[in-house]
Protein backbone atom coordinates (compact mmCIF):
# COMPACT_ATOMS: atom_id res chain seq x y z
CA UNK A 1 0.00 0.00 0.00
CA UNK A 2 2.73 2.44 0.90
CA UNK A 3 4.65 1.62 -2.28
CA UNK A 4 1.54 2.27 -4.31
CA UNK A 5 1.11 5.64 -2.65
CA UNK A 6 4.73 6.70 -3.24
CA UNK A 7 5.19 5.63 -6.90
CA UNK A 8 4.12 8.96 -8.47
CA UNK A 9 5.11 9.67 -12.12
CA UNK A 10 6.43 13.12 -13.11
CA UNK A 11 3.63 15.65 -13.62
CA UNK A 12 5.11 17.49 -16.64
CA UNK A 13 5.97 16.29 -20.12
CA UNK A 14 6.72 17.90 -23.45
CA UNK A 15 7.98 21.36 -24.38
CA UNK A 16 4.73 23.16 -25.31
CA UNK A 17 2.53 24.78 -22.67
CA UNK A 18 -0.83 23.11 -22.65
CA UNK A 19 -3.59 25.56 -21.95
CA UNK A 20 -6.76 24.03 -20.53
CA UNK A 21 -10.04 25.74 -21.53
CA UNK A 22 -12.18 25.97 -18.39
CA UNK A 23 -15.28 27.17 -20.19
CA UNK A 24 -17.60 25.02 -22.19
CA UNK A 25 -20.29 26.14 -24.61
CA UNK A 26 -23.28 24.52 -26.17
CA UNK A 27 -22.56 23.28 -29.70
CA UNK A 28 -25.60 23.85 -31.94
CA UNK A 29 -26.76 20.67 -33.63
CA UNK A 30 -29.63 20.99 -36.02
CA UNK A 31 -30.64 17.29 -36.27
CA UNK A 32 -30.32 16.75 -32.46
CA UNK A 33 -32.35 19.68 -31.09
CA UNK A 34 -33.97 17.50 -28.41
CA UNK A 35 -30.55 16.83 -26.79
CA UNK A 36 -29.58 20.53 -26.53
CA UNK A 37 -30.66 22.38 -23.33
CA UNK A 38 -32.98 25.33 -23.81
CA UNK A 39 -31.01 27.54 -21.40
CA UNK A 40 -27.45 28.77 -21.87
CA UNK A 41 -26.82 30.27 -18.40
CA UNK A 42 -27.21 29.06 -14.82
CA UNK A 43 -30.04 30.74 -12.93
CA UNK A 44 -29.99 29.17 -9.46
CA UNK A 45 -27.46 30.05 -6.76
CA UNK A 46 -26.85 26.36 -5.92
CA UNK A 47 -25.86 25.58 -9.51
CA UNK A 48 -23.50 28.57 -9.64
CA UNK A 49 -21.91 27.46 -6.36
CA UNK A 50 -21.43 23.92 -7.66
CA UNK A 51 -19.75 25.21 -10.82
CA UNK A 52 -17.55 27.62 -8.84
CA UNK A 53 -16.41 24.77 -6.54
CA UNK A 54 -15.59 22.57 -9.55
CA UNK A 55 -13.71 25.42 -11.29
CA UNK A 56 -11.69 26.03 -8.14
CA UNK A 57 -10.85 22.30 -7.89
CA UNK A 58 -9.72 22.25 -11.56
CA UNK A 59 -7.55 25.32 -10.96
CA UNK A 60 -5.94 23.70 -7.89
CA UNK A 61 -5.27 20.45 -9.75
CA UNK A 62 -3.76 22.48 -12.61
CA UNK A 63 -1.32 24.04 -10.13
CA UNK A 64 -0.62 20.69 -8.42
CA UNK A 65 0.32 19.12 -11.77
CA UNK A 66 2.88 21.92 -12.28
CA UNK A 67 4.40 21.50 -8.79
CA UNK A 68 6.70 18.68 -9.99
CA UNK A 69 8.61 21.26 -12.08
CA UNK A 70 8.94 23.38 -8.94
CA UNK A 71 10.17 20.31 -7.03
CA UNK A 72 12.75 19.38 -9.69
CA UNK A 73 13.97 22.99 -10.33
CA UNK A 74 13.78 24.85 -6.99
CA UNK A 75 16.89 26.95 -7.70
CA UNK A 76 15.23 28.54 -10.77
CA UNK A 77 12.40 29.95 -8.64
CA UNK A 78 14.15 30.84 -5.33
CA UNK A 79 15.03 34.37 -6.47
CA UNK A 80 11.38 35.25 -7.14
CA UNK A 81 9.89 33.59 -4.00
CA UNK A 82 9.53 34.94 -0.44
CA UNK A 83 11.45 33.32 2.44
CA UNK A 84 8.51 31.49 4.02
CA UNK A 85 7.61 30.03 0.64
CA UNK A 86 11.21 28.86 0.05
CA UNK A 87 11.32 27.34 3.55
CA UNK A 88 8.04 25.47 3.02
CA UNK A 89 9.22 24.29 -0.41
CA UNK A 90 12.50 22.95 1.02
CA UNK A 91 10.67 21.11 3.80
CA UNK A 92 8.34 19.66 1.19
CA UNK A 93 11.30 18.52 -0.95
CA UNK A 94 13.09 16.99 2.08
CA UNK A 95 9.99 15.05 3.10
CA UNK A 96 9.49 13.84 -0.46
CA UNK A 97 13.15 12.75 -0.76
CA UNK A 98 13.05 10.81 2.53
CA UNK A 99 9.74 9.28 1.51
CA UNK A 100 11.16 8.06 -1.81
CA UNK A 101 14.34 6.71 -0.14
CA UNK A 102 12.41 4.79 2.51
CA UNK A 103 10.02 3.45 -0.10
CA UNK A 104 12.94 2.16 -2.19
CA UNK A 105 14.51 0.57 0.92
CA UNK A 106 11.20 -1.07 1.80
CA UNK A 107 10.84 -2.33 -1.76
CA UNK A 108 14.36 -3.86 -1.74
CA UNK A 109 13.69 -5.58 1.57
CA UNK A 110 10.40 -6.90 0.32
CA UNK A 111 12.12 -8.39 -2.76
CA UNK A 112 14.87 -9.92 -0.61
CA UNK A 113 12.23 -11.47 1.67
CA UNK A 114 10.47 -12.99 -1.32
CA UNK A 115 13.77 -14.46 -2.54
CA UNK A 116 14.54 -16.00 0.88
CA UNK A 117 11.18 -17.65 1.44
CA UNK A 118 12.82 -21.03 2.21
CA UNK A 119 14.72 -19.68 5.27
CA UNK A 120 13.68 -20.14 8.89
CA UNK A 121 10.23 -19.04 10.04
CA UNK A 122 11.51 -17.00 13.00
CA UNK A 123 13.79 -14.91 10.83
CA UNK A 124 10.94 -14.38 8.36
CA UNK A 125 8.63 -13.26 11.16
CA UNK A 126 11.24 -10.78 12.43
CA UNK A 127 11.70 -9.38 8.93
CA UNK A 128 7.95 -9.13 8.45
CA UNK A 129 7.65 -7.18 11.71
CA UNK A 130 10.43 -4.82 10.59
CA UNK A 131 8.70 -4.39 7.23
CA UNK A 132 5.42 -3.55 8.98
CA UNK A 133 7.21 -0.94 11.12
CA UNK A 134 8.77 0.59 7.99
CA UNK A 135 5.33 0.67 6.36
CA UNK A 136 3.86 2.50 9.37
CA UNK A 137 6.70 5.05 9.27
CA UNK A 138 6.21 5.36 5.54
CA UNK A 139 2.50 6.10 6.04
CA UNK A 140 3.29 8.86 8.52
CA UNK A 141 5.77 10.32 6.03
CA UNK A 142 3.10 10.11 3.32
CA UNK A 143 0.68 12.06 5.55
CA UNK A 144 3.40 14.67 6.21
CA UNK A 145 4.09 14.89 2.47
CA UNK A 146 0.38 15.42 1.82
CA UNK A 147 0.17 18.17 4.47
CA UNK A 148 3.25 19.91 3.07
CA UNK A 149 1.75 19.70 -0.42
CA UNK A 150 -1.39 21.43 0.87
CA UNK A 151 0.76 24.13 2.52
CA UNK A 152 2.73 24.78 -0.68
CA UNK A 153 -0.49 24.89 -2.68
CA UNK A 154 -1.98 27.41 -0.24
CA UNK A 155 1.11 29.60 -0.60
CA UNK A 156 0.99 29.30 -4.41
CA UNK A 157 -2.66 30.36 -4.42
CA UNK A 158 -1.77 33.36 -2.29
CA UNK A 159 0.77 34.56 -4.90
CA UNK A 160 -1.02 35.09 -8.26
CA UNK A 161 2.16 36.52 -9.87
CA UNK A 162 4.11 33.40 -8.95
CA UNK A 163 1.26 31.28 -10.33
CA UNK A 164 1.52 33.01 -13.71
CA UNK A 165 5.33 32.68 -13.64
CA UNK A 166 5.08 28.96 -12.87
CA UNK A 167 2.62 28.44 -15.72
CA UNK A 168 5.01 30.24 -18.11
CA UNK A 169 8.22 28.46 -17.03
CA UNK A 170 6.82 24.92 -16.59
CA UNK A 171 7.41 22.93 -19.82
CA UNK A 172 4.16 20.98 -19.62
CA UNK A 173 2.35 18.10 -17.93
CA UNK A 174 2.60 14.34 -18.02
CA UNK A 175 0.06 12.37 -20.08
CA UNK A 176 -1.59 11.10 -16.89
CA UNK A 177 -2.00 14.60 -15.43
CA UNK A 178 -3.24 15.95 -18.75
CA UNK A 179 -5.71 13.06 -18.98
CA UNK A 180 -6.95 13.86 -15.44
CA UNK A 181 -7.44 17.54 -16.33
CA UNK A 182 -9.19 16.66 -19.58
CA UNK A 183 -11.48 14.32 -17.67
CA UNK A 184 -12.30 17.04 -15.12
CA UNK A 185 -13.01 19.55 -17.89
CA UNK A 186 -15.22 16.98 -19.59
CA UNK A 187 -16.95 16.39 -16.23
CA UNK A 188 -17.46 20.16 -15.90
CA UNK A 189 -19.08 20.33 -19.32
CA UNK A 190 -21.30 17.37 -18.50
CA UNK A 191 -22.27 18.86 -15.11
CA UNK A 192 -22.89 22.27 -16.71
CA UNK A 193 -25.20 20.69 -19.29
CA UNK A 194 -26.87 18.64 -16.52
CA UNK A 195 -27.57 21.77 -14.45
CA UNK A 196 -28.94 23.60 -17.48
CA UNK A 197 -31.30 20.75 -18.33
CA UNK A 198 -34.78 20.92 -16.79
CA UNK A 199 -36.73 17.79 -15.70
CA UNK A 200 -39.02 18.16 -18.72
CA UNK A 201 -36.01 18.22 -21.05
CA UNK A 202 -34.55 15.19 -19.24
CA UNK A 203 -37.77 13.28 -19.86
CA UNK A 204 -37.79 14.38 -23.50
CA UNK A 205 -34.16 13.36 -23.88
CA UNK A 206 -34.80 9.95 -22.32
CA UNK A 207 -37.82 9.49 -24.57
CA UNK A 208 -35.74 10.51 -27.60
CA UNK A 209 -32.96 8.08 -26.65
CA UNK A 210 -35.49 5.29 -26.11
CA UNK A 211 -37.02 5.98 -29.53
CA UNK A 212 -33.58 5.91 -31.14
CA UNK A 213 -32.71 2.66 -29.34
CA UNK A 214 -35.98 1.08 -30.44
CA UNK A 215 -35.39 2.26 -34.00
CA UNK A 216 -31.84 0.89 -33.84
CA UNK A 217 -33.11 -2.45 -32.57
CA UNK A 218 -35.66 -2.62 -35.38
CA UNK A 219 -33.01 -1.69 -37.93
CA UNK A 220 -30.68 -4.31 -36.46
CA UNK A 221 -33.40 -6.94 -36.75
CA UNK A 222 -34.00 -5.95 -40.38
CA UNK A 223 -30.24 -6.05 -41.03
CA UNK A 224 -29.99 -9.51 -39.44
CA UNK A 225 -32.88 -10.77 -41.56
CA UNK A 226 -31.35 -9.29 -44.71
CA UNK A 227 -27.95 -10.76 -43.84
CA UNK A 228 -29.50 -14.18 -43.29
CA UNK A 229 -31.38 -13.85 -46.57
CA UNK A 230 -28.18 -12.72 -48.31
CA UNK A 231 -26.29 -15.69 -46.88
CA UNK A 232 -28.99 -18.05 -48.15
CA UNK A 233 -28.96 -16.37 -51.56
CA UNK A 234 -25.16 -16.62 -51.73
CA UNK A 235 -25.30 -20.28 -50.77
CA UNK A 236 -27.93 -20.94 -53.43
CA UNK A 237 -25.95 -18.93 -55.95
CA UNK A 238 -22.76 -20.86 -55.17
CA UNK A 239 -24.59 -24.16 -55.55
CA UNK A 240 -26.09 -22.97 -58.84
CA UNK A 241 -22.67 -21.78 -60.05
CA UNK A 242 -21.19 -25.17 -59.18
CA UNK A 243 -23.96 -26.91 -61.07
CA UNK A 244 -23.49 -24.62 -64.08
CA UNK A 245 -19.72 -25.17 -64.01
CA UNK A 246 -20.31 -28.90 -63.96
CA UNK A 247 -22.71 -28.60 -66.90
CA UNK A 248 -20.23 -26.39 -68.79
CA UNK A 249 -17.45 -28.91 -68.23
CA UNK A 250 -19.64 -31.72 -69.51
CA UNK A 251 -20.60 -29.61 -72.54
CA UNK A 252 -16.93 -28.88 -73.24
CA UNK A 253 -16.12 -32.57 -73.14
CA UNK A 254 -19.08 -33.35 -75.34
CA UNK A 255 -18.08 -30.56 -77.74
CA UNK A 256 -14.54 -31.90 -77.94
CA UNK A 257 -15.87 -35.32 -78.82
CA UNK A 258 -18.27 -33.81 -81.35
CA UNK A 259 -15.44 -31.83 -82.91
CA UNK A 260 -13.44 -35.01 -83.38
CA UNK A 261 -16.27 -36.83 -85.13
CA UNK A 262 -17.46 -33.81 -87.11
CA UNK A 263 -14.62 -33.76 -89.66
CA UNK A 264 -15.62 -37.05 -91.29
CA UNK A 265 -19.29 -36.19 -91.26
CA UNK A 266 -18.43 -32.78 -92.73
CA UNK A 267 -16.74 -34.37 -95.73
CA UNK A 268 -19.68 -36.69 -96.30
CA UNK A 269 -22.19 -33.90 -95.99
CA UNK A 270 -20.15 -31.76 -98.37
CA UNK A 271 -20.27 -34.42 -101.08
CA UNK A 272 -23.97 -34.98 -100.52
CA UNK A 273 -24.55 -31.23 -100.58
CA UNK A 274 -22.83 -30.89 -103.95
CA UNK A 275 -25.04 -33.60 -105.41
CA UNK A 276 -28.14 -32.05 -103.88
CA UNK A 277 -27.08 -28.63 -105.14
CA UNK A 278 -27.02 -29.85 -108.74
CA UNK A 279 -30.47 -31.37 -108.37
CA UNK A 280 -31.82 -28.22 -106.70
CA UNK A 281 -30.32 -26.01 -109.42
CA UNK A 282 -32.22 -27.83 -112.09
CA UNK A 283 -35.45 -27.69 -110.13
CA UNK A 284 -34.90 -23.99 -109.38
CA UNK A 285 -34.61 -23.17 -113.06
CA UNK A 286 -38.04 -24.66 -113.60
CA UNK A 287 -39.50 -22.79 -110.56
CA UNK A 288 -37.90 -19.51 -111.73
CA UNK A 289 -39.68 -19.60 -115.08
CA UNK A 290 -42.95 -20.34 -113.33
CA UNK A 291 -42.52 -17.51 -110.80
CA UNK A 292 -41.77 -14.98 -113.56
CA UNK A 293 -45.10 -15.79 -115.15
CA UNK A 294 -46.81 -15.37 -111.73
CA UNK A 295 -45.08 -11.98 -111.25
CA UNK A 296 -46.43 -10.65 -114.53
CA UNK A 297 -49.94 -11.70 -113.59
CA UNK A 298 -49.66 -10.14 -110.11
CA UNK A 299 -48.41 -6.84 -111.53
CA UNK A 300 -51.46 -6.52 -113.72
CA UNK A 301 -53.68 -7.34 -110.72
CA UNK A 302 -51.80 -4.77 -108.58
CA UNK A 303 -52.34 -2.01 -111.18
CA UNK A 304 -56.06 -2.71 -111.21
CA UNK A 305 -56.25 -2.59 -107.37
CA UNK A 306 -54.37 0.74 -107.20
CA UNK A 307 -56.81 2.38 -109.57
CA UNK A 308 -59.74 1.07 -107.51
CA UNK A 309 -58.34 2.29 -104.13
CA UNK A 310 -57.47 5.87 -105.18
CA UNK A 311 -61.07 7.04 -104.84
CA UNK A 312 -61.37 5.48 -101.39
CA UNK A 313 -58.11 7.19 -100.38
CA UNK A 314 -59.40 10.64 -101.37
CA UNK A 315 -62.59 10.12 -99.33
CA UNK A 316 -60.53 9.06 -96.30
CA UNK A 317 -58.25 12.12 -96.63
CA UNK A 318 -61.25 14.46 -96.57
CA UNK A 319 -62.56 12.70 -93.47
CA UNK A 320 -59.10 12.96 -91.82
CA UNK A 321 -58.91 16.74 -92.49
CA UNK A 322 -62.33 17.22 -90.92
CA UNK A 323 -61.32 15.25 -87.82
CA UNK A 324 -58.06 17.23 -87.46
CA UNK A 325 -59.93 20.57 -87.54
CA UNK A 326 -62.32 19.31 -84.86
CA UNK A 327 -59.36 18.19 -82.72
CA UNK A 328 -57.70 21.63 -83.00
CA UNK A 329 -60.93 23.31 -81.91
CA UNK A 330 -61.18 20.99 -78.92
CA UNK A 331 -57.52 21.67 -77.99
CA UNK A 332 -58.07 25.46 -78.04
CA UNK A 333 -61.18 25.08 -75.91
CA UNK A 334 -59.22 22.85 -73.47
CA UNK A 335 -56.39 25.42 -73.23
CA UNK A 336 -58.87 28.19 -72.37
CA UNK A 337 -60.56 26.08 -69.69
CA UNK A 338 -57.19 25.01 -68.22
CA UNK A 339 -56.06 28.66 -68.03
CA UNK A 340 -59.19 29.53 -66.07
CA UNK A 341 -58.63 26.50 -63.81
CA UNK A 342 -54.97 27.51 -63.29
CA UNK A 343 -55.98 31.01 -62.18
CA UNK A 344 -58.56 29.55 -59.84
CA UNK A 345 -55.94 27.10 -58.47
CA UNK A 346 -53.45 29.92 -57.79
CA UNK A 347 -56.13 31.88 -55.91
CA UNK A 348 -56.95 28.79 -53.84
CA UNK A 349 -53.27 28.14 -53.18
CA UNK A 350 -52.74 31.70 -51.85
CA UNK A 351 -55.82 31.29 -49.62
CA UNK A 352 -54.43 27.93 -48.45
CA UNK A 353 -51.07 29.51 -47.51
CA UNK A 354 -52.80 32.25 -45.51
CA UNK A 355 -54.93 29.67 -43.70
CA UNK A 356 -51.82 27.57 -43.05
CA UNK A 357 -50.09 30.57 -41.42
CA UNK A 358 -53.19 31.20 -39.31
CA UNK A 359 -53.18 27.52 -38.34
CA UNK A 360 -49.53 27.75 -37.21
CA UNK A 361 -50.34 30.81 -35.08
CA UNK A 362 -53.30 28.96 -33.55
CA UNK A 363 -51.08 25.96 -32.81
CA UNK A 364 -48.55 28.17 -31.05
CA UNK A 365 -51.34 29.79 -29.01
CA UNK A 366 -52.72 26.34 -28.23
CA UNK A 367 -49.28 25.18 -26.98
CA UNK A 368 -49.01 28.27 -24.75
CA UNK A 369 -52.54 27.72 -23.42
CA UNK A 370 -51.77 24.04 -22.76
CA UNK A 371 -48.71 25.01 -20.72
CA UNK A 372 -50.72 27.62 -18.77
CA UNK A 373 -53.50 25.08 -18.21
CA UNK A 374 -51.02 22.50 -16.88
CA UNK A 375 -49.54 25.11 -14.50
CA UNK A 376 -53.00 26.21 -13.31
CA UNK A 377 -54.03 22.60 -12.89
CA UNK A 378 -50.91 21.81 -10.84
CA UNK A 379 -51.52 24.89 -8.65
CA UNK A 380 -55.18 23.90 -8.16
CA UNK A 381 -54.15 20.37 -7.18
CA UNK A 382 -51.66 21.76 -4.65
CA UNK A 383 -54.31 24.16 -3.24
CA UNK A 384 -56.89 21.35 -3.03
CA UNK A 385 -54.37 19.15 -1.19
CA UNK A 386 -53.63 21.99 1.24
CA UNK A 387 -57.35 22.62 1.75
CA UNK A 388 -58.05 18.90 2.41
CA UNK A 389 -55.10 18.78 4.83
CA UNK A 390 -56.44 21.86 6.66
CA UNK A 391 -59.91 20.33 6.89
CA UNK A 392 -58.43 17.12 8.30
CA UNK A 393 -56.40 19.13 10.80
CA UNK A 394 -59.56 21.02 11.84
CA UNK A 395 -61.47 17.74 12.27
CA UNK A 396 -58.63 16.36 14.43
CA UNK A 397 -58.60 19.54 16.52
CA UNK A 398 -62.40 19.45 16.98
CA UNK A 399 -62.24 15.78 18.02
CA UNK A 400 -59.41 16.51 20.42
CA UNK A 401 -61.33 19.47 21.90
CA UNK A 402 -64.50 17.40 22.35
CA UNK A 403 -62.46 14.59 23.91
CA UNK A 404 -60.72 17.02 26.29
CA UNK A 405 -64.07 18.58 27.24
CA UNK A 406 -65.61 15.14 27.83
CA UNK A 407 -62.66 14.07 30.01
CA UNK A 408 -62.80 17.34 31.94
CA UNK A 409 -66.54 17.08 32.52
CA UNK A 410 -66.18 13.47 33.69
CA UNK A 411 -63.41 14.50 36.00
CA UNK A 412 -65.56 17.32 37.47
CA UNK A 413 -68.53 14.96 37.93
CA UNK A 414 -66.36 12.35 39.67
CA UNK A 415 -64.82 14.97 41.95
CA UNK A 416 -68.29 16.32 42.87
CA UNK A 417 -69.58 12.79 43.57
CA UNK A 418 -66.47 12.05 45.64
CA UNK A 419 -66.97 15.21 47.75
CA UNK A 420 -70.66 14.36 48.29
CA UNK A 421 -69.76 10.83 49.45
CA UNK A 422 -67.22 12.24 51.90
CA UNK A 423 -69.76 14.70 53.33
CA UNK A 424 -72.26 11.88 53.80
CA UNK A 425 -69.63 9.78 55.55
CA UNK A 426 -68.79 12.65 57.93
CA UNK A 427 -72.46 13.10 58.89
CA UNK A 428 -72.83 9.39 59.75
CA UNK A 429 -69.63 9.38 61.85
CA UNK A 430 -70.75 12.33 63.96
CA UNK A 431 -74.10 10.69 64.75
CA UNK A 432 -72.60 7.30 65.74
CA UNK A 433 -69.56 8.27 67.78
CA UNK A 434 -69.82 11.64 69.48
CA UNK A 435 -67.03 12.50 71.84
CA UNK A 436 -64.50 10.32 70.01
CA UNK A 437 -61.68 12.27 68.33
CA UNK A 438 -59.88 11.02 65.27
CA UNK A 439 -56.12 10.74 65.16
CA UNK A 440 -54.08 13.56 63.70
CA UNK A 441 -53.02 11.50 60.69
CA UNK A 442 -56.63 10.76 59.66
CA UNK A 443 -57.56 14.44 60.03
CA UNK A 444 -54.67 15.43 57.82
CA UNK A 445 -55.74 12.87 55.20
CA UNK A 446 -59.28 14.21 55.21
CA UNK A 447 -58.08 17.81 54.89
CA UNK A 448 -56.01 17.04 51.79
CA UNK A 449 -58.87 15.78 49.58
CA UNK A 450 -61.02 18.69 50.73
CA UNK A 451 -58.39 21.13 49.61
CA UNK A 452 -58.12 19.34 46.26
CA UNK A 453 -61.90 19.41 45.80
CA UNK A 454 -62.00 23.15 46.44
CA UNK A 455 -59.27 23.79 43.93
CA UNK A 456 -61.08 21.80 41.26
CA UNK A 457 -64.37 23.56 41.87
CA UNK A 458 -62.73 26.90 41.36
UniProtKB/Swiss-Prot annotation:
Subcellular location: Cytoplasm, Cytoskeleton, Flagellum axoneme
Keywords: Cell projection, Cilium, Coiled coil, Cytoplasm, Cytoskeleton, Flagellum
Composition bias, Basic and acidic residues: 428-445
Region (Disordered): 419-458
InterPro entries for this protein: DRC10, IQ_motif_EF-hand-BS
Comp. bias regions, Basic residues: 446-458
Disulfide bonds: none
A GO cellular-component term linked to this record: cytoplasm
Coiled-coil region(s): 96-137, 209-255, 285-379
Domain IQ: 397-426
Task performed by this protein: Component of the nexin-dynein regulatory complex (N-DRC), a key regulator of ciliary/flagellar motility which maintains the alignment and integrity of the distal axoneme and regulates microtubule sliding in motile axonemes.
Subunit structure: Component of the nexin-dynein regulatory complex (N-DRC). Interacts with CFAP52.
PANTHER family given in the database record: DYNEIN REGULATORY COMPLEX PROTEIN 10, IQ DOMAIN-CONTAINING PROTEIN D
Family recorded in the similarity comment: Belongs to the DRC10 family.
Protein name according to UniProt: Dynein regulatory complex protein 10
Amino acid sequence: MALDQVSIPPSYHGLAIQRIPLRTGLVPAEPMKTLVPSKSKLNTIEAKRIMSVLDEAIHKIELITLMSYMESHPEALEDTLPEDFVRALREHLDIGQTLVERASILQRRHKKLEEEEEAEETRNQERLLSLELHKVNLLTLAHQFRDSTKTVLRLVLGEPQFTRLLQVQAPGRSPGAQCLLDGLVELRGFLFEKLLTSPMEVREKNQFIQDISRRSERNQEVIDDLQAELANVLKNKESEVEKENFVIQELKNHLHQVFKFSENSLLRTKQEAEKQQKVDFRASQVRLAKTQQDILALRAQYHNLVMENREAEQALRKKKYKVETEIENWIQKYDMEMGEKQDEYEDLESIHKEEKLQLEELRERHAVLVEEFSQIRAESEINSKKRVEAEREMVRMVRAATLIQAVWKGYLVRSILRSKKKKRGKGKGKDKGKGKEKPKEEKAKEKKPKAKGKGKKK
